[in-house]
């Protein structure tokens, strides 16, 4: 195994406890238009980890929400979310100390399905932005989780291979994206998992945990040839590919 060089963290449910906040904000936005609320069980099993617009598209298909109200609900939900985040998300000294120490050894990035405004507010509340190399919100990608684009973009930005990178995720959709990226994955049960000693233990036992979780990381020590392809690759980009054209899998 190559030496680990990069760490990528999801935001919601990993660094901040926001599942209930997003649940309440969405239901408050729906109820303001006299639309039936969703249960917390459904939110966890179906909607958790998805951008708001994709949650609404599911409600559209279920005939719970008329599509014409989507834009209104998105605006209301985001406004309520920011209000709740400002009220309930607090500085976490354990997270701060963890990122302070980790940043001395690894590149750190954040990859979330949250909007940029939510991402920036949470990083400000946690006071960890200075330890992060860069961050991506759902506004920075064409395809959100469970598509792996956000993680592939992180790899390109960091200049790292999947075998050099560990992802921390919690939601079903996020885990799917992380697995499809080919990176190492640690599934977070709760925010208390994110502490320096635990993360070092995870890294030190990475090989064993990968085998236990049966996550396949692609590698081939014999492959060392890169064959460039002509053209700018605009058709590939429009089709949703993230990596530069010469690096697209065939």
Model-flagged regions — what are they?
Residues 218-250:
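N-terminal glycine-rich phosphate-binding loop and ensuing alpha1 helix
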Residues 2-96, 104:
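N-terminal helical cap/lid subdomain that shapes the substrate entry/recognition surface
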Residues 1-3, 116, 121-214:
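Asp-based, Mg2+/Mn2+-dependent phosphohydrolase catalytic module
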Residues 84-90, 113, 248-250:
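Short, flexible loop segments at the rims of nucleotide/cofactor-binding pockets, characterized by
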Residues 15, 45, 108-111, 143, ...:
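Conserved SAM-binding loop
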Residues 7, 165, 223-225:
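Conserved hydrophobic helix-helix packing surfaces used for dimerization/oligomerization
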């Amino acid at each position: 195994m190559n030496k680990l060089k990069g760490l990528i963290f999801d935001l919601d449910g990993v660094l901040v406890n926001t599942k209930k906040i997003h649940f309440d904000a969405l239901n408050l936005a729906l109820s303001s238009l006299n639309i039936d609320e969703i249960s917390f069980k459904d939110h966890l099993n179906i909607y958790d980890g998805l951008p708001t617009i994709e949650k609404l598209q599911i409600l559209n298909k279920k005939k719970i929400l008329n599509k014409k109200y989507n834009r209104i609900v998105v605006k209301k939900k985001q406004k309520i979310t920011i209000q709740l985040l400002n009220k309930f998300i607090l500085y976490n000294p354990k997270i701060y100390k963890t990122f302070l120490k980790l940043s001395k050894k690894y590149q750190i990035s954040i990859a979330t399905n949250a909007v940029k405004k939510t991402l920036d507010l949470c990083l400000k509340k946690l006071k960890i932005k200075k330890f992060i190399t860069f961050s991506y919100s759902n506004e920075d990608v064409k395809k959100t989780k469970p598509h792996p684009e956000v993680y592939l973009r992180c790899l390109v930005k960091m200049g790292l291979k999947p075998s050099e990178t560990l992802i921390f995720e919690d939601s079903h959709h996020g885990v799917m994206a992380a697995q499809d990226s080919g990176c190492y994955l640690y599934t977070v049960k709760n925010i208390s998992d994110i502490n320096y000693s635990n993360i070092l233990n995870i890294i030190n036992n990475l090989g064993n945990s990968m085998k236990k979780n049966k996550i396949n990381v692609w590698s081939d020590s014999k492959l060392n040839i890169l064959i460039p392809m002509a053209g700018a690759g605009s058709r590939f980009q429009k089709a949703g590919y993230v990596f530069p054209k010469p690096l697209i899998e065939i």
